[in-house]
Amino acid sequence: MAATSFNVRDLINSNGADAMGVRGLVDAHATKAAEEQFEYIKRSKKVWVRQILSASDGEKMQKRFGGTFDLQLSKNLCPHSFAGAMRQCETLECLSSFPEDSLILDFGGSWLFHWQRQHNVHSCCPVLDARDMARHQERMISMQKCVAHRPGKFESFESPDFCLLKAEDCEVQSPYAISIHGAYDMGFEGLCKAMHSHGTIMLRGTMMFDANMLVFNEGVMEDLNCRWTKEKGDPYGLRGAPCEDMVHFDFIDESTLSYSHSWKNIKSFLTEGGYQIGNVQYVLERCVISYGIMSFKIFAVSGKIPHTRLRHCVWFPKVRDYVNINPSDPRIWSKVRVKLDTVREVEEICFRCPKDVSKIEVMGGESETCGIMSVLYSSTIIVNGMTMMAGERLDVLDYHHVAFSLMLSARRKFDMFGKAMNSLEWKGWVSHFFKSLWPSGDLRDLFGRYFPSLIRYYDKIEFVEKLTHCEVFVNELGMTDDKEQRDVVAEAADVLKNTLLKVAIKMSLDKTFRPAEEKKEERTTTTTVTSSAVGDVDERPAGTVSGPTIQAPSVTQENTVTSLSEPLDGRLAVRLEAMKEYKRYLLKLQKNTESNLAGLWSLCGGTSDSNNLISTEVLRIMRQSDSLVNLHKADGGWLFPNDFEYMVGYNSSGLGEKRPNEVFLVNKDCVLNNNVLLANGVPAQPPKGNINLMDGVAGCGKTTAIKRAFVFESDLIVTANKKSSEDILKAMFRDTPDIGRNKVRTADSVLMHGVAHKVKRVLFDEVSLVHFGQLCAILTISGAEELIGFGDSEQISFVSRDRLFDMKYHKLSPDSSDQQIRTFRCPKDVVECVKIMARKVGARGSKYNNWFTTSAVRKSLGYHKVSSINESPLRPDVHYLTMTQADKASLLSKARETRFRPSVSTIDEVIKTTHESQGISVPKVILWRGKSTKCDLFTDKMELRFGCCHQASRKFRLLFGC
């Protein structure tokens, strides 16, 4: 059988590409690549750009931003198209650096851009000249046009959020900010000061950048089609120019308005790297520099930071291949940049010149011709009879002067070589002696060193000057520590300083806009816009335009906290700021209540036009964290069994009082909804009376001291909660409760209803539970000369019900304080237990390290592990404490399921969190913890350390859920 031989490899090489398997493999890879590209395109954000962009501009945008943005061009003819499209994408890129839905400040940006996209951005848009006001007018008209053309979309939008104040004068607080081409008028130092006043910890911005500004007086940014020129300032007004040096930006071949900015401000972003304000340091980081735009970041850092040296370089890539040619007459001609290759060619031609050097010196015209021909030769080359460009053409006015300067440079080099040759020859001892004193041995050089006028201009001028490729800048920042160094006046001004990083994240999600208050020394302008499309614009503080805030029911503006006409000392200034903060806090709580119920109403299918709900299943889920969530039906019944009375409810008509036949939602905030009344009760003036604190340990007899110190004719007793008020009434006015109610009041009652009789002194029980602003308001309302507060500064202080609200003045600031470390109530084992916990958390300065007791009870504490909450039956004679609201909700749920009835008071009075039970003494306490993790008692949270200080006898049990 004959064997047939053939080459398999040749067969594969010739026909392999047509194989079905190969085609399938290629198709699979191609399909996968196409799918990835489509997915990438879908992830990119669509950006609608009005401008016409060329193909090269589109490639630049793609290279700069990658696939982040999908440009949708409407192809309208607009000025400086590429720069405008870049600015739009830069804004979106900077906004994407921060958490979504967080409040962001925009220094100098367009509020219309953010309003059209409903960004949570507050824009500071100061009116620095008529051009800025024209921009505002244009944006107002554009907004009206949007509403008129598409009312279904834009009428539901909130009003634009912006102000007409400078960035450093606006008082809206946020840890995040952007500045898109808005830093030219502020400079690096001004931008840092604006960040400091806003409590901003990170800023992202962009600006036009050309490193050649540090070297030359004019230049061109080709990608932006923009020419810049520097103008020398005229501080004395002799030439009619601006006082300071300016940089003018003109867009080539576009007869649009140009931009002029301070050279000092622009230069600061090229030369500076850091700035320090007190204990806060601001560090500038330059990110991307491309197509004439620099993207930068500024971070605010504080704490314990050593002495820092910041070094950065500014490179000049555009001048790397150039040299400066200095013409022979600098009074007429400035320095001219010439390509380095051109200069090299000229030097080569001069060295290869066939004529003798001596003849060139004599024949000036011929040497000039040689120089000119050398420049011509360097600019063009002849290949096979064809002329081709080899270098860069010079300006027609500079051509001959540059050629002459290059010829003089070459001639002087020949002179130097001749002198060098002569210096190598031996000319006797005299010349040798002079050469030992100076290298050249020429008397002219010796005297010229001390008498420059003896040197000819030809000898001292530098015809060819090498340009620097890089310039190094070093900035130094001082050392900072982590200790607060603020006096009372600085505390009143409060610029966050060392607490900056601690509160920044909490502020980031706070959408509340606090308009800047009008300053007496500022000159402001009120802008009013009336249009049927936009609607009426409410009156706001001068110079401020903000988005609408949800007004609580029956809010009156008659009793607002305003600035005093006379300057305040530090103590009164702090009190006034505390009262302002307390009022803002109350209104924020009211807004939160309405917002939460509105979201719940929407989840149930409710709308602003109808009370018909689609599903109430979400309410069953919400009751796990808030047992008071409920739905009132039209027939008067409730969705879940209810034992409470609610002041207000929420439905399509908003938050307020409801009729028995209405459908509405309620939660725990609707039981007692008096935030608006409390806010209206805050007076406008700070109190001048003294505030003294009796700071005692738990069970030291604070309430007993109040009873003994009380003077019926002139004193008023104020308590932080209703339970303490009832206890004092029973102890002091058991037989005359009606009279006692005028002498023993809660803090909320004083704010809402005032004081009926003259008060000389206020005795405040559990003063640490209230906001310092509320304490000051009560002292002002009562008109008392003194307020004595009884409480424990180390137990649970005032805790905000809005974790995102920025609290600065809630802590007590008494004029004097007196400590008491003896307790009558707490058993001995409780005292020792708290001492151990205080040491565990490192509270070395705590008064609980040295407290002692007179109680005879030695053992009252115990603990017991249970597998679930059902394993421990609820006892009617015991008060239950929890550390979390979730544990409290589980206990309340069990109490309602088992129809638990306590022997005293109601279910909500015997089941509380450790914070809610502050200041209450009961015989028996059980602390329930629903998880078996590391014990929370050994932390720095005060409500966890002192949960065992409420019982007065032998009954305290700690139940752990396994």
UniProtKB/Swiss-Prot annotation:
Residues 536-561 are annotated as: Disordered. Its EC number is 3.6.4.-, 2.1.1.-. Residues 79-356 are annotated as: Methyltransferase. One of its GO terms (cellular component) is membrane. The keyword Secreted does not apply. The keyword ATP-binding applies. Residues 667-820 form the (+)RNA virus helicase ATP-binding domain. One of its GO terms (molecular function) is ATP binding. Keywords: ATP-binding, Helicase, Host endoplasmic reticulum, Host membrane, Hydrolase, Membrane, Methyltransferase, Nucleotide-binding, Transferase. It is a peripheral membrane protein. It is found in: Host endoplasmic reticulum membrane. Residues 546-561 have a biased composition (Polar residues). Residues 71-270 form the Alphavirus-like MT domain. Belongs to the bromoviridae replication protein 1a family. Interacts with RNA-directed RNA polymerase 2a. Involved in the virus replication. Contains a helicase domain and a methyltransferase domain. The methyltransferase domain is probably involved in viral RNA capping. Involved in the formation of ER membrane spherular invaginations in which RNA replication complexes form. This is Replication protein 1a.
